[in-house]
């Protein structure tokens, strides 16, 4: 049996690993990097930034724990972002190794579903057609842009942009009080921004 999976995020690679362990011949098609939104612009990067924010926030409460002295700690954004990149790179390498161990064939490119059993993949080298008995579509998500507030990646940022800032903004307005918005609000407030959340 052959299976093609479109999307190498948590849904896609989990399905690929389970199918491969069951003896299925798996082709996993990924447009960019294994790990998807969760690994590259979601759960893992935000938790990594948040751990830095937690440490910085805790440092302001040292006296509560009987630790005194003078210290002026601040967020070093290039170092924080570099740490985040190392964490995601390490986890991505782990996924690549697991694919190799389980003999999951990974094809990097843009997938097009031609029929229920045929996927056309446009890669840097050209076009490849992958035929299989079944296809799983696990294509993930991307940040929503509001027509009234276009992202310019300078003053108006996407949540992805907020994970790569090289300096702490003096103030920040976050549109959206969901999980991502509130998490970014906590992170940047801990780093020293004056944060307003609009919901």
Residues covered by each model-derived region:
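Rossmann-like NAD(P)H-binding beta-loop-alpha module
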Residues: 166-199
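Conserved acidic residues
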Residues: 9, 110-112, 178
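Conserved N-terminal Rossmann-fold NAD(P)-binding element of oxidoreductases
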Residues: 6-7, 29, 137, 175-176
